[in-house]
Each structure stands twice: as structure tokens, then as C-alpha cells.
Amino acid sequence: MKIGFIGCGNMASAMISGMLKKGLYKKDEIIVSNLTEEGSKRSREKLGVVTTLDNHEVVKNTKLVFLAVKPQFYEEVLNEVKDELTPEHTVVGIAPGKTLAWLEEKCGQPLKVVRMMPNTPAQVGEGMTGVCANEKVSAEELAQICEITDSFGRTEVVPERLMDAVSAVSGCSPAYVFMFIEAMADAAVAQGMPRKQAYQFAAQALLGSAKMVLETGMHPGELKDMVCSPAGSTIEGVRILEQNGFRSAVFEALNGAAEKLSLIHI
């Protein structure tokens, strides 16, 4: 079965790269539409997939269609292609705030609809994607979607009511992690370390720590305690972070992001 993407920006490119690396699809089984010939040329050169400037061609030639345009263009695109959509199609939205009900309504007929929220680490094969689907999507079809998202990271199926939480803890949080890495590196530079080297130490520390959580199954608090020797330097750093509201700031940032996302539901 062929697969289609309407739009092929950074996220779609990351998704397609993962599928190709995992061998889920061949290059000639993936068709993408771009707004310009320049964009089509980039997609062909970077990914080697079939390209077109016509969104209708994507829908006519595939049964699994990913909407990979910016959120503000979703309605325009769906209005353009809805006459070509059939009950055999599955439409997948990857934008925050576009609910399953809204997507199905804009498709103009009862259809299989999926929402997913990938994040930018998908670009290096370490994405985290939350997925939900309407009742028309079978378990087998949902498993196929999850196989695709697993090709560029990890996947969790969640009820739609949790998609804002997914967006906050997974979609938004890379920005906060990058801020933390930058702050750690700044501190190392203040201690005399060259900046490039400081970024390596800070980023690898976060990468390794995250892998410990995922691969050991241990509670993050337990892993933290393993590093904190009595009266040592690490527990002193923990004390200062707590004194300055580190945990509370993270909590409020994620809650604030989720609340903001809830305001754009349509």
C-alpha cells in the first residue's frame, strides 16, 4: 500500500526518513506534495520519494494520507481534497488542537481519522509520539500507524483527552530541555571549559540520564538518590535547585503549555 504526505517540511521529512531506514516502505511507495517546485526538488534529492505539486494526486494514489502542512492550512487543504476521499482512506493529522471530530467534519464524510503528536527529536530517530484514533480505525490499522511512528522513536496510544498533555510533556518539552542544556553549558564555561566541549558534556549527561530511566525501569527519584552522596556536591546542587523552585517551574511550564493548547481546540 502506498502512503502519502500533503506537505513535506522538517517533521514529514523526519517521519519519511525513519520509515525508509526501517524498510517499512520503498521510496516509490511514498508520494509527497509540495507547494513549490523547489520544495519538490528538495524532497526528491533528500528522500528520493515520488513528488507532486498536486494534493489531489496524493489522495488519489494512496489510502493513508498524512496532513503535514501548518495548522492554519488544514481546513483549506481538506476542503480542496475532500471530494477524492473515500471510506477506505485514513487521514492522519499531526497538528496540535485539531480534534478527531473536527478532522472528520472537514473531510466531509465519516472517515477513519487519526491524530498524532510527534516531536522534533524524530529528526534524529528519537522522537516520542502520542497517537489516538476514532472508532472507525481498526486495531490492525492503528498498529500500522504505530509501526510507522516507532520507526522514528517511541509511541504511546492515548485517549484523545490526553493529547494536550502529550503535546506539553513531549511536543513542547524539547525546548525546555535545550534551555537546560544551554544553562548547564554556561555554568561549565564559567568554570573555564570551552563552549563546544561544554555542550558535549551537558547534552550527553541528559541523553545518558534519559536512557537510564527508559532502560532500567527505575523511578527517577531513585536514580537521583544514587548520585547524591551524603554531604556531597550533588545533593548540595539539588538543594539549590529546590530552593530556587526548579521542580515547581517545570511543573508550571508544562501546565501552562497544556492550558494554552486547550484554548486552540477546534
Whereabouts are the PLM-identified features?
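C-terminal substrate-binding/catalytic lobe of Rossmann-fold NAD(P)-dependent oxidoreductases
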Residues: 191-255
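NAD(P)+-binding Rossmann beta1-loop-alpha1 motif at the extreme N-terminus of oxidoreductases
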Residues: 1-46, 50-53, 189-191
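Conserved small/polar residues in nucleotide/adenosyl-binding loops
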Residues: 264-266
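Hydrophobic residues within alpha-helices
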Residues: 15-16, 81, 184
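Rossmann-like NAD(P)(H) cofactor-binding subdomain of soluble oxidoreductases
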Residues: 37, 46-47, 55-60, 64-131, ...
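A short glycine-threonine-serine/GTX helix/turn-capping micro-motif
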Residues: 166-175, 196, 224
